[in-house]
Amino acid sequence: MVEIEYGKVRIKLGDTAHVYEPAEDSFLLADAALKEAKPGMRILEVGAGSGFVSAVLLANLKDIHLLATEINPHAARCAKANGVEVIRTDLFRGIKPEKPENRFDLILFNPPYLPTSKEEKVPGWLNYAFDGGISGRETLERFLDEARAYLKPGGKILVLISSITGLEAVKEIMKSLGFKADVVERKKVSFEELIVVRGKLL
């Protein structure tokens, strides 16, 4: 059993052949989320993976109501083992936005962002953690298209992207969907820069 310690949290990862191991992108999103989240908030993490970011929030903030979604069954089990309430589904599917309890103050997403051709796909469930389609933005664009319906008035999203993903392209998409987009965290790592973009409903 692989475990990671991060501040107050010890994360159980299980089989890393099937579950993405938290790395610099996960840590940067967790740091940004800790600054944005407040007690009493309703928070949704989409594509929670091992549950790392959600577990960090639960360990550090009182009285938050947190739900997560995850498509990978191995990762969903891992998130549950880390104390996260998780629904196994694709993005928002199955969450009905017309119900008040399914509107959130803050929605988090660390999408797969590597530009990936058919020949570059990884076998098995782990592909969902990396494969951003040809542009690297395919899953992110689906998320952005749907996110507004799940936010409370004045709600915010935090998305982790890479310089590979194209910051200006992402900001333009967010603007076209009614979000004010601001960079709130960034970190240079190896061949890329990791960036957290906050989108606030206008």
PLM regions with names:
Residues 1-202:
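Auxiliary N-terminal substrate/complex-recognition segments of SAM-dependent methyltransferases
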